[in-house]
């Protein structure tokens, strides 16, 4: 019987994010293109005698109160589904910054679901895990399988796309966050400013054109987020001035990323930026990875 499992929880960016309007349930209808990237957290799950324990590293990493933590939520939702106990100790090693729009919380929940399913031999399908995961976060279903996909609804209705041409991403995040609810509230007050579309990005991916993909990057939430956190706009401008083929904010921010054609250009830009978080990444064709069991 396996006693412990270790997994990679991969971050994501949104190549395009189009807000289609508010929904009666308080969420927003979206059309977006997700892409998994090589930045990741590590989730280690170990069987325990009873209960649930979460240890977050490094000490002081901001993950919020336990009852709002996505790892805890994923565990609770799975125990409710199977109507049984899953006593574990979870160690979460954070590398993906929180409040960045990079899917850190969602990917942690995704890895937790995959890990619990394997550790306890639950034999749930990916489709069942994705359905459970939606209760922990709108991006969890994508983060389970990862790769490249169009997301609709709140992002949970997924259609796979061809992987992008090889490239490097420089991901940067300012110190300040803005908060999803605050961003959407500001967006709703400025309706009519929609500029982004997923169509050029989908076309570029199907044609395998990196230049067209980079030119098509866009996010309807960037203007309002930039008003709340001006560093977002500044980072985007710095990345473009450094020679990026294209740049935009990911998700609800406040992380900004840029596409570069070569690793050398990306590394040079990484060294030149003064943001608190800067990382060179690559697109990857998968979601959660089991490292050890």
What is the predicted role of each segment?
Residues 50-64, 112, 134, 207-217:
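Short, basic/glycine-rich phosphate-binding loops at helix/coil junctions
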Residues 15, 43-45, 71, 105, ...:
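Residue-level signal for inorganic ion chemistry
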Residues 17, 41-45, 139-143, 149-150, ...:
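Short beta-strand scaffold segments in enzyme catalytic cores
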Residues 91-120, 138, 244-260:
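Glycine/serine-rich anion-binding loops at beta->alpha junctions
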Residues 109, 113-150:
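Contiguous, small/hydrophobic- and glycine-enriched helical/loop subdomains that border
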Residues 1-100, 118, 122-127, 154, ...:
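ATP-binding N-lobe of GHMP and related small-molecule kinases
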Residues 145, 150-246, 261-274, 279-293:
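Conserved, helical-rich catalytic subdomain that frames metal- and/or nucleotide-binding sites
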């Amino acid at each position: 019987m396996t006693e412990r499992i270790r997994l990679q929880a991969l971050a994501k960016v949104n190549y395009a994010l189009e807000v289609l309007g508010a929904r009666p349930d308080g969420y927003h209808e979206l059309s977006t293109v997700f892409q998994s990237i090589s930045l990741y957290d590590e989730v280690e799950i170990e069987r325990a005698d009873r209960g649930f324990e979460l240890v977050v590293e490094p000490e002081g990493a901001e993950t919020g109160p336990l009852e709002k933590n996505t790892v805890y939520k994923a565990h609770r939702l799975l125990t409710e589904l199977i109507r049984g106990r899953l006593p574990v100790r979870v160690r979460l090693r954070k590398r993906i910054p929180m409040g960045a729009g990079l899917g850190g919380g969602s990917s942690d929940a995704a890895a937790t679901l995959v890990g619990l399913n394997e550790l306890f031999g639950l034999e749930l399908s990916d489709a069942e895990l994705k359905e459970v995961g939606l209760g922990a976060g709108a991006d969890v279903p994508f983060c389970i399988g990862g790769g490249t996909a169009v997301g609709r609804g709140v992002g949970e209705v997924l259609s796979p796309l061809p992987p992008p041409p090889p490239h490097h991403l420089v991901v940067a995040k300012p110190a300040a966050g803005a908060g999803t609810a605050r961003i959407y509230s500001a967006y709703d007050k400025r309706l009519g400013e929609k500029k982004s579309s997923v169509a050029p990005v989908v076309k570029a991916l199907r044609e395998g054109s990196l230049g067209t993909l980079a030119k098509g990057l866009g996010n309807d939430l960037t203007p309002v987020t930039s008003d709340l956190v001006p560093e977002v706009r500044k980072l985007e401008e710095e990345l473009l001035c450094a020679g990026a083929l294209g740049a935009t904010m990911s998700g609800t921010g406040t992380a900004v990323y840029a596409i570069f054609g070569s690793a050398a250009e990306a590394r040079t830009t990484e060294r030149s930026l003064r943001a608190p978080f800067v990382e060179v990444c690559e697109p990857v064709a998968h979601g959660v990875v089991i490292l050890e069991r």
